[in-house]
Regions:
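N-terminal targeting signals for export/organelle localization
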Residues: 1-50, 187
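Short, ordered coil/turn segments that flank beta-strands lining enzyme active or ligand-binding pockets
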Residues: 7, 54-55, 157
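A short beta-strand-turn-helix
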Residues: 39-69
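Extracytoplasmic
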Residues: 44-46, 64-66, 97-100, 112, ...
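Short active-site neighborhood of thiol/selenol oxidoreductases, capturing the structured segment around
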Residues: 59-82, 88, 102
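Structural microenvironment flanking redox-active thiols in thiol-disulfide oxidoreductases
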Residues: 82-122, 133-139
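Thiol/disulfide oxidoreductase modules built on the thioredoxin-like
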Residues: 119-123, 131-184
């Protein structure tokens, strides 16, 4: 496990609320970066989700069959989300066209705010707006713990969570290595 210093955000009623346990307990990460790769034999079932992007386009897990998918949970007022946005875009630009896709999951903002964030921070990949029923967040939370915002997941070509980064991404090379590992796996 790799540990680095960071800060993470918490939006009341956001993804963390979707993660709340039966006793109402919630898990948060603050003060460190956690990277966890999951060996193929230990991965859970593929994540099935469907939502609508900030531009009104329908998107679902079916759109990413046989691709490595990077999913980033974020919102516009989250300081670490702002800091890591250029790093995520750098990794996206590096791997774009190599059976890799990127998808944001905005857990708090209206579509216009998400579009402004993308324009202001140079983010070119789409984001699902998941503020109404939290169905996308809940689909992922059913398969893997999402304890803080931002959280970044790498899904293998089968749609299973292969790696999880909890907290602010500190270096593009961390995510790039996780994507490369997932790309090298045989299905």
């Amino acid at each position: 496990m790799l540990a680095l210093t960071l800060s993470s955000c918490s939006a009341g009623g956001g993804l963390e609320a979707a993660q709340a346990g039966s006793a109402g307990t919630q898990e948060f990460v603050s003060g460190d970066l956690r990277v966890h790769e999951i060996p193929p034999a230990e991965r859970r079932e593929p994540v099935r989700f469907a939502g609508v992007t900030e531009r009104g386009d329908a998107v679902s897990s079916d759109d990413f069959v046989d691709q490595v998918l990077v999913v980033n949970f974020w919102y516009a007022a989250c300081g670490p989300c702002i800091v890591e946005a250029p790093l995520l875009e750098e990794v996206w630009q590096t791997h774009q066209g190599n059976d890799v896709a990127f998808l944001g999951v905005n857990i708090y903002d209206q579509p216009s705010t998400a579009e402004s964030f993308a324009a202001d921070n140079g983010v070119s990949y789409p984001s699902v707006i998941d503020i109404v029923d939290k169905s996308v967040s809940q689909a992922f939370a059913a398969v893997t713990p999402i304890q803080a915002t931002p959280t970044t997941l790498v899904l293998d070509r089968q749609g299973r969570v292969a790696a999880r980064i909890i907290g602010e991404l500190q270096s593009a090379s961390i995510l790039s290595a996780l994507v490369a590992d997932a790309l090298q796996e045989t299905t």
